[in-house]
Design a protein with these regions (language model features):
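Fe-S-dependent hydro-lyases/dehydratases of central metabolism
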Residues: 1-759
Length: 759
């Protein structure tokens, strides 16, 4: 089904994988070096066209367009305003697809929307009102273009199937673009994803995506690299099918994606009235990839990602045949994911040897596409979901899709079967809509199934869980009233209905400034919208207290700052910070704020020892070796340790919440994604790396760590950072900071990106 090549591989004429350089020469009659062949990837060409550094090893990228949704654009624009924003220099689309229900906090969600609308007018942007489209579907329909690059403040910013290299990053990276700065990275590796064969009837894009995620996540095969889709199997897939695979590449932890394009993508642009934005893309005659994943589409069967990660993948048939073993494995993994905070079991879902689920949902940027929903309607037509616990909801990804589904009868078929068809909303993907009952088990064609991502509150003793599946198998399960069923078991005649896009919907409702700013527009600030608090520059010496210690193999951004209803407070930095690590380590906020008292005293010109008594013996021990430490040259803050933090969302708040609570650093064995590490840096936090085994650390939660001359070490680009765990003695430890650009070092020295741009 899938094969991962050990090392790099050549692709000759877009069809033949060859690992031996001599064989390439024999096939082509010419000698091609790896260095030359690397420049023949589609990714290289697009990056080269957007790089202004003149150095293809150290890229400085200028994007063509930007996009954000309503739980990120407020913080981004507030940061940009504090840094000197006068006008959006490139198209910037603000969608309102996350806090759309306005069910939490009174007026605060709609207040954010009004902030967005007035900013779009004032600075020259585009505003997509609530329920019109989810962020990524609008981008596909209206923004993507062949050979273009788009940066979004959402991790699933992926439009590679349309020939657009798109990346999801934390808000500060968008701020840089808004201020006419660049996105600075080393040239990423490019991994070929070679598609062969053709999917069998009943297999959908989520099945292919989950198979790829299952093969590449744990081993980091594509981590922070570009996935480039090639091979004869590509042409066997519709545009919608490719889009459905592409959006899920984020769950592999790749940096971006790009696909070869053809007449099916050309037709997509024509349908959306943008034929001029199509560009044919293909790899060169001889292309070298840093790795290669071979995918035989014909062998893929309906898949399921069991709780609590998209990489926890099985075929549905495997689950049904080995039900007891699979459920036991899921429950054992849950002990780690949930820290034993609640009792979790799926055994009660087994009735007469069959697994029954409580809820089915098809939604958002992954599931809400036209073809997915049409296929679901074809499957469920003539069936009904029953009048018991099982519920089934479908969220088309945009109003134009919804309208076409109404016109072609798909909505009627779904509703007659008992399905509820709702508006374009990302809620089921991040815990703000269709939260199941306690102990319920939901199957969803959405992007993630992290703990509590469906909206349950662990700190209240609640637990529900989600398995990811394709829309087709979810509909098959719904047709069987919740009995887990692969779509390949259903005898269905798929209509294959043609899509018609009605552009009048957006023309009549979306505000588009066409790049014309109106500086006289007054921004509407809701009561919950607050400015970022002042942040200090990096001190000469740093005293850190470890205030949380996490030993999970991977820590997600959902654990660092929860999603769901918590997201409504993202316009208020200090208010949101109260929820930091609330599901993983409820005592974290209190510990961090206690340590922060010392730094606030320093900033007020007072003695930190007077407000934090426990600091007295710590400083006494430090001054035995460093007698000058503490005399106007020290900062005090908190740090967390996590094995591998930062998987999941691009949300900058995973870092900024730590910062506004006095965080100065993270310590990790590695960082799960480039975007989380960038968020730390942009908020002035040191991304320390330790080589120590997480089971044998030199420090523990509650310990103080002294980092002498940290400012000088950052300035001098020191390879290693010497620090001391403060106890009865000073125990030396060594950290590294990893590769950093000069600008990133300066941001840390200044204390945060806002300070950096203020000068």
């Amino acid at each position: 089904m899938l094969k991962l090549y050990d090392g790099g591989a050549y692709l000759v004429n877009g069809t033949e994988i060859i690992t031996d350089e001599a064989e390439v020469k024999a096939k082509t009659g010419r000698e091609v070096s790896k260095e030359e062949a690397r420049t023949q990837t589609m990714a290289y060409g697009i990056l080269e066209a957007h790089n202004i550094s003149g150095n293809m090893e150290r890229l400085q990228i200028k994007f063509d367009k930007l996009t954000s949704h309503d739980i990120t654009f407020v913080g981004i624009i507030q940061t940009a305003r504090a840094s000197g924003l006068e006008k959006f220099p490139i198209p910037y689309v603000l969608t309102n697809c996350h806090n759309s229900l306005c069910a939490v906090g009174g007026t605060i969600n709609e207040d954010d929307h009004m902030f967005g609308l007035t900013c779009a007018k004032k600075y020259g942007g585009v505003y997509v009102p609530p329920h019109q489209a989810v962020i990524h579907q609008f981008a596909r329909e209206m923004l993507a273009g062949g050979g273009k690059m788009i940066l979004g403040s959402d991790s699933h910013t992926r439009y590679g199937a349309l020939g657009t290299m798109a990346m999801g990053e934390g808000g500060p990276e968008l701020v840089k673009q808004l201020l006419n700065k660049t996105y600075d990275i080393k040239m990423p590796g490019v991994i070929g994803i070679y598609l062969d064969g053709e999917p069998v009837k009943g297999v959908g894009p989520q099945d292919v995506a989950l198979a790829i995620i299952g093969a590449t996540f744990a081993n980091g095969y594509v981590n922070n690299k570009v996935m480039e889709f090639v091979g004869p199997g590509v042409e066997k897939l519709s545009a919608d099918f490719r889009i459905g695979i592409d959006v899920m590449t984020t769950e592999t932890t790749c940096l971006s994606s790009i696909w070869k394009t053809d007449d099916k993508i050309k037709e997509f642009y024509e349908i959306h009235g943008r034929s001029e934005d199509y560009k044919e893309l293909n790899p060169g005659a001889v292309t070298y990839y840093d790795g290669m994943v071979y995918v035989n589409l014909s062998e893929i069967r309906p898949m399921i990602a069991m709780p609590f990660h998209p990489s926890n993948v099985y075929t549905i048939d495997e689950v049904r045949k080995n039900l007891k073993d699979v459920l036991h494995d899921v429950e054992q993994k849950a002990l780690v994911s949930l820290d034993g905070a609640v009792d979790y079991s799926l055994q009660d879902k087994v009735i007469d040897g069959k697994l029954y689920v409580d809820q089915g949902i098809i939604a958002g940027c992954a599931g809400g596409g036209f073809e997915n929903i049409c296929a679901a309607a074809d499957i469920i037509k003539g069936h009904y979901i029953g009048s018991d616990e099982f519920t089934f909801s479908v969220y088309p990804a945009s109003t134009p899709i919804y309208m076409e589904l109404v016109k072609n009868g798909a909505v009627a078929d779904l509703m007659e079967a008992g399905t509820i068809v709702k508006t374009a909303f990302c809620g089921p993907c991040f815990g703000a809509g269709d939260t199941p009952a306690n102990n319920a088990f939901s199957i969803r064609h959405s992007t993630r199934n992290f703990p509590n991502r469906e909206g349950s509150k662990l700190q209240s003793g609640q637990i529900a869980s989600v398995a990811l599946m394709d829309a087709r198998s979810i509909a098959a399960t719904a047709a069987n009233k919740g009995f887990l069923t692969p779509a390949t078991d259903m005898d269905v005649e798929y209509k294959g209905q043609k899509y018609h896009f009605d552009q009048k919907i957006y023309a009549n409702r979306v505000f588009d400034s066409h790049g014309v700013a109106d500086p006289d527009t007054k921004i509407k600030f809701g009561l919950n919208i607050k400015d970022w608090p002042a942040m200090s520059a990096l001190p000469e010496n740093l005293v850190l207290k470890v205030v949380s210690e996490i030993h999970d193999p991977v820590t997600t951004t959902d654990e660092l700052i929860p999603s769901g209803e918590t997201s409504s407070y993202r316009s208020n930095p200090l208010g949101l910070a109260e929820f930091a690590l609330s599901r993983k380590d409820p005592a974290y906020v209190g510990r961090a704020k206690e340590v922060q008292k010392a730094q606030k005293a320093i900033e007020a010109g007072e003695c930190p020892l007077e407000v934090l008594e426990e600091l007295k013996p710590v400083m006494a021990k430090i001054q035995e070796k460093y007698p000058e430490a503490g005399k106007g040259n020290i900062g005090v803050g908190s740090t967390i340790f996590a094995v591998k933090p930062g998987d999941g969302s691009a949300r900058e708040q995973a870092a900024s919440c730590q910062k506004v609570l006095g965080g100065w650093a993270n310590i990790a064995n590695e960082y799960a994604t480039k975007r989380y590490r960038s968020n730390l840096i942009n908020w002035g936090m040191l991304p320390f790396i330790t080589k120590e085994d997480d089971k044998k650390l030199s420090f523990k939660n509650g310990d103080y760590i002294f980092v002498p001359e940290i400012r000088k070490a950052v300035e001098n680009k020191d390879a290693e950072i010497k620090a001391y765990v403060v106890g009865d003695t000073l125990k030396e430890v060594t950290f590294t900071l990893g590769d950093m650009t000069d600008a990133e070092r300066e941001i840390i020295l200044k204390g945060c990106l806002i300070n950096y741009y203020k000068g």
